[in-house]
């Protein structure tokens, strides 16, 4: 049995979980998330969700822990939310946000304007003498990671000087320059 899949998920106060027609819906103070679940039996009793598989097929074994982790992430998201922070390292690199648009100046001849989904909130922090920071926040963990990866892809950090957009706390593999 899957080590992750066999452990139950507790439902905190203020969160409602519903399972109908193979779709689990989680509602909380930060929003609502849905996940389609196939081949795994979901049981909701006394604020505890358990996941059981009907057979020992390899695809069901693989999905057992996956669906448990996805539902747990959904509950965590509608309760506390998720945040990823990116740091813009480079001279003249700037980030500003106007509503649901993020404007990045990262060394190209033009600014990059990124339209964001309504579920995603972006905050830009610019202090004098420090690198600008972009914080991506949402109740959907997958969406936060996807938007943060897209922002990072506009100017991934290069290994020689370390310039580019990197996650806060990310360790870059640096290379030595050519020797004289």
UniProtKB/Swiss-Prot annotation:
A GO term, aspect molecular function: rRNA binding
GO CC entries: cytosolic large ribosomal subunit
Keywords: Ribonucleoprotein, Ribosomal protein, RNA-binding, rRNA-binding
UniProt xrefs under SUPFAM superfamilies: Ribosomal protein L6
A single GO BP: cytoplasmic translation
InterPro entries (UniProt xref): Ribosomal_uL6-like (IPR000702), Ribosomal_uL6-like_a/b-dom_sf (IPR036789), Ribosomal_uL6_a/b-dom (IPR020040), Ribosomal_uL6_bac-type (IPR019906), Ribosomal_uL6_CS (IPR002358)
Any Pfam family the entry gives: Ribosomal_L6
PANTHER family listed in its UniProt record: 60S/50S RIBOSOMAL PROTEIN L6/L9, LARGE RIBOSOMAL SUBUNIT PROTEIN UL6M
Main function: This protein binds to the 23S rRNA, and is important in its secondary structure. It is located near the subunit interface in the base of the L7/L12 stalk, and near the tRNA binding site of the peptidyltransferase center.
Family: Belongs to the universal ribosomal protein uL6 family.
Assembly information from the UniProt record: Part of the 50S ribosomal subunit.
Name this polypeptide is given: Large ribosomal subunit protein uL6
Native source species: Christiangramia forsetii (strain DSM 17595 / CGMCC 1.15422 / KT0803)
GN (gene name): rplF
């Amino acid at each position: 049995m899957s080590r992750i899949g066999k452990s139950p998920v507790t439902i905190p106060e203020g969160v409602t979980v519903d399972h109908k027609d193979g779709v689990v819906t989680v509602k909380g103070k930060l929003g609502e998330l849905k996940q389609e679940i196939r081949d795994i039996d979901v049981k909701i009793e006394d604020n505890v969700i358990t996941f059981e598989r009907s057979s020992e097929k390899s695809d069901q074994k693989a999905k057992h822990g996956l669906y448990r982790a996805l539902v747990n992430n959904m509950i965590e998201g509608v309760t506390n939310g998720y945040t990823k922070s990116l740091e813009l390292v480079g001279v003249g690199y700037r980030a500003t946000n106007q509503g649901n648009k993020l404007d990045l100046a990262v060394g190209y001849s033009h600014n990059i304007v990124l339209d964001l989904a309504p579920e995603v909130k972006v905050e830009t922090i610019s202090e004098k003498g420090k690198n600008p920071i972009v914080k991506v926040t949402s109740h959907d963990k997958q969406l936060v990671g996807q938007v943060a990866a897209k922002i990072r892809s506009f100017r991934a950090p290069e290994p020689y000087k370390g310039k580019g957009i990197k996650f806060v706390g990310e360790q870059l593999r640096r290379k030595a320059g050519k020797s004289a």
